[in-house]
């Protein structure tokens, strides 16, 4: 094996490890706000199913009611599935991103537009590829996070844990139930990851220069701006996919992503597609932390700098 091939394998392993570790730490820290986001986002579906007594008036109301009814530890409900899911997801995203970017072979000297498009394509392809491996865990995390205690059902939960989600879903809907909402997820992940990686890689050499070069704070803020923009653009797709996830095990289901989108807009209004978006913007701080921690950890531990 040539020295270049060995170096590529080493870089791949570094990308896999650093991306996964950074993601696991960041997602655990952001678990409370992420659960609030999922509860607010799916509250209309939860009310239909009788698992929520009344709508949340906002982020603060959701925090207060959840803490009072379920306890503080409940904010980490579904976090185990999220960490299990997020570790390989982010690790594969970061690892495949650089691999796929090499396949495009575009250099900045060949033209900024082509180079920027290559970054978008590599980031999007990496995200979509990773999704194939971990979608069922994303489904389970959503069902656990949206499984609130309801007085209408005597305070009982629908699921007792990660394994229970799999058992009940497979029993009622089969393997297809674990992949409900997959197609809008693929579209959403391409949009989100494409912007997430592509814009960061493209804007970093333009913004993080001079005194800002190597600055963790500057890298973090740039990452936050990028993740906020990317997540807001793709948020309606995220709402559609999660609402489709919520129908597994239910008698009434949507006939695809378009049908789901139409029914949400018709019965709840366009604004419903963005419910929980405010909490999602706060949650994106974790995403910014991941991408900046990824850079910093590689520079500290391995002396690797991106160009």
Curated annotation (Swiss-Prot):
GO biological process, one term: mitochondrial ADP transmembrane transport
Disulfide bond entries: none
UniProt keyword annotation of Transmembrane present: yes
Transmembrane spans: 12-39, 80-104, 112-132, 182-203, 217-237, 277-297
Binding site for ADP: 85, 97, 241
Catalytic activity: ADP(in) + ATP(out) = ADP(out) + ATP(in)
Region of interest (Important for transport activity), residue spans: 241-246
Membrane topology: Multi-pass membrane protein
Residue positions of motif Nucleotide carrier signature motif: 241-246
GO molecular function: ATP:ADP antiporter activity; identical protein binding
Superkingdom of the source species: Eukaryota
Signal peptide from the UniProt entry: none
Location in or out of the cell: Mitochondrion inner membrane
InterPro entries in the record: ADT_euk_type, Mit_carrier, Mitochondrial_sb/sol_carrier, Mt_carrier_dom_sf
Regulation (activators, inhibitors): The matrix-open state (m-state) is inhibited by the membrane-permeable bongkrekic acid (BKA). The cytoplasmic-open state (c-state) is inhibited by the membrane-impermeable toxic inhibitor carboxyatractyloside (CATR).
PANTHER family found in the cross-reference section: ADP,ATP CARRIER PROTEIN 1-RELATED-RELATED (PTHR45635), ADP_ATP TRANSLOCASE (PTHR45635:SF14)
Subunit annotation: Monomer.
Domains: entry comment: The transmembrane helices are not perpendicular to the plane of the membrane, but cross the membrane at an angle. Odd-numbered transmembrane helices exhibit a sharp kink, due to the presence of a conserved proline residue.
Family: Belongs to the mitochondrial carrier (TC 2.A.29) family.
Miscellaneous note of the record: Present with 1080 molecules/cell in log phase SD medium.
Name used for this protein in its record: ADP,ATP carrier protein 3
């Amino acid at each position: 094996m040539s020295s270049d091939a060995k170096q590529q394998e080493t870089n791949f392993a570094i990308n896999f490890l650093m991306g996964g570790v950074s993601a696991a730490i960041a997602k655990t820290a952001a678990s409370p706000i992420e659960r609030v986001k999922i509860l607010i986002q799916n509250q209309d579906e939860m009310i239909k199913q009788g698992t929520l007594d009344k709508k949340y008036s906002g982020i603060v109301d959701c925090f207060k009611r959840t803490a009072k009814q379920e306890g503080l530890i409940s904010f980490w409900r579904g976090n185990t599935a999220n960490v299990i899911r997020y570790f390989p997801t982010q690790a594969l995203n970061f690892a495949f991103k650089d691999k796929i970017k090499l396949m495009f072979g575009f250099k900045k000297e060949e033209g900024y537009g082509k180079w920027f498009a290559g970054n978008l394509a590599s980031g999007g392809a990496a995200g979509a590829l990773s999704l194939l491996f971990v979608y069922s865990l994303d489904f389970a995390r959503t069902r656990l996070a949206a499984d609130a205690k309801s007085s209408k059902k005597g305070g009982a939960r629908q699921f007792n844990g990660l394994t229970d989600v799999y058992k009940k879903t497979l029993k009622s809907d089969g393997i297809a139930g674990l992949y409900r909402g997959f197609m809008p997820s693929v579209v959403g992940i391409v949009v989100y990851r494409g912007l997430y990686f592509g814009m960061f890689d493209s804007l970093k050499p333009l913004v993080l220069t001079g005194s800002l070069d190597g600055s963790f704070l500057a890298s973090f803020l740039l990452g936050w701006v990028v993740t906020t923009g990317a997540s807001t653009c793709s948020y309606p797709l995220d709402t559609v996919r999660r609402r489709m996830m919520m129908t597994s095990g239910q008698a009434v289901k949507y006939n695809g992503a378009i049908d789901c989108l139409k029914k949400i807009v018709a019965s709840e209004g366009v604004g419903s597609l963005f419910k929980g978006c405010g909490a999602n913007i706060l949650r994106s701080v974790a995403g910014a932390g991941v991408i900046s921690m990824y850079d910093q950890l590689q520079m500290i531990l391995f002396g690797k700098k991106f160009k």
